[in-house]
C-alpha cells in the first residue's frame, strides 16, 4: 500500500522533530511519498520579495525552492530515498517507479504543496493522505481567532470546503485549499489531519486510526 504524507513546513523549524520524522518514515512499510512545505524560510523570503516589489509568480518560486530545500534535507536523513527532489509530477512518477521513498516539494507557481500532495496521492493510487499540519485537527473556525471553534473529528469534503472558503479563515489556516480538496474528493481519497508536532500520529493514521480529523467523500 502506498502512503502519502504532507509535512507542514513548520516541522523543519525544529531540528529534533525532523530527525524523528525521518525515523518514522524510514520504519514505515511499503512505498512512501512525502511532500514538504516551505515553512518559515518560505514566509521570510516571500515577505522580503513582496516588500521589494517582486511579482506573485516570483514569490511563489521562492516558496517552491524553500519547500524543495526542506525536501532535500529530509532526503539526506533517509538513506534509501530517491536522492533528488522531483520538480514535477512526471519526474516524481519516474522516481516512484524505482524507489521505495520519494520526497518532493512544490512543483509550479500558483500551486500549493497541499495540491502537490493531492496530485501525488492521485497519481500513486493512495487510499489516504496523511496531513501533518500546524494544527491538531480541523475546526469549524480558526481556533487561534475564535475560542469557540469546534473541533471536528470526522467530516465530509463538502463541509471541509465550506470551512476553507469561509472569509473568516484566510488561507484556511494553512491546512489545504480548494484545488487540493477537489482532487482528493474526485478520487475519494481519505485525508487525516493531525498535529505535525507528533510524528507518532503518522504511524497511527497509517493504521487507519484517527489522531485528529478524518475527512471523507
From Swiss-Prot:
Notes on activation and inhibition = Inhibited by UTP.
**Group of enzyme by EC:** transferase
Identify the pathway: Pyrimidine metabolism; CTP biosynthesis via de novo pathway; UDP from UMP (UMPK route): step 1/1
GO molecular function terms here? ATP binding; UMP kinase activity
Q: Where in the cell is it found?
A: Cytoplasm
Q: What is its main location?
A: cytoplasm
InterPro entries in the cross-refs: AceGlu_kinase-like_sf, Asp/Glu/Uridylate_kinase, Uridylate_kinase, Uridylate_kinase_arch/spir
PANTHER family named in the record: URIDYLATE KINASE, URIDYLATE KINASE PUMPKIN, CHLOROPLASTIC
Matching HAMAP family, A to Z?
A: PyrH_A
Oligomeric and partner information: Homohexamer.
> In which family does this protein belong, per the annotation?
Belongs to the UMP kinase family.
* Role according to the record: Catalyzes the reversible phosphorylation of UMP to UDP.
Q: What is this protein called?
A: Uridylate kinase
- The scientific name of the source species is Pyrobaculum aerophilum (strain ATCC 51768 / DSM 7523 / JCM 9630 / CIP 104966 / NBRC 100827 / IM2)
Amino acid at each position: 500500500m502506498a502512503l502519502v504524507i504532507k509535512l507542514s513546513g513548520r516541522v523543519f523549524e525544529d531540528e529534533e522533530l525532523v530527525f524523528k520524522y525521518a525515523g518514522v518514515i524510514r520504519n514505515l512499510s511499503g512505498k512512501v511519498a512525502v511532500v514538504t512545505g516551505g515553512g518559515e524560510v518560505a514566509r521570510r523570503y516571500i515577505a522580503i520579495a513582496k516588500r521589494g516589489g517582486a511579482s506573485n509568480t516570483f514569490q511563489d518560486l521562492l516558496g517552491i525552492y524553500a519547500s524543495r530545500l526542506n525536501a532535500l534535507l529530509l532526503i539526506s536523513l533517509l538513506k534509501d530515498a530517491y536522492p533528488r527532489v522531483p520538480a514535477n509530477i512526471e519526474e516524481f512518477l519516474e522516481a516512484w517507479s524505482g524507489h521505495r521513498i520519494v520526497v518532493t516539494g512544490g512543483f509550479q507557481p500558483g500551486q500549493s504543496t497541499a495540491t502537490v500532495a493531492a496530485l501525488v496521492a492521485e497519481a500513486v493510487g493512495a487510499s489516504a493522505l496523511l496531513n501533518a499540519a500546524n494544527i491538531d485537527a480541523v475546526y469549524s473556525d480558526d481556533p487561534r481567532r475564535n475560542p469557540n471553534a469546534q473541533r471536528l473529528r470526522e467530516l465530509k469534503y463538502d463541509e471541509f470546503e465550506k470551512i476553507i472558503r469561509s472569509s473568516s479563515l484566510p488561507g484556511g489556516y494553512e491546512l489545504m485549499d480548494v484545488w487540493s480538496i477537489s482532487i482528493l474528493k474526485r478520487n475519494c481519497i481519505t485525508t487525516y489531519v493531525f498535529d505535525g508536532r507528533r510524528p507518532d500520529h503518522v504511524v497511527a493514521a497509517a493504521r487507519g486510526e484517527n489522531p485528529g480529523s478524518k475527512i471523507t467523500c
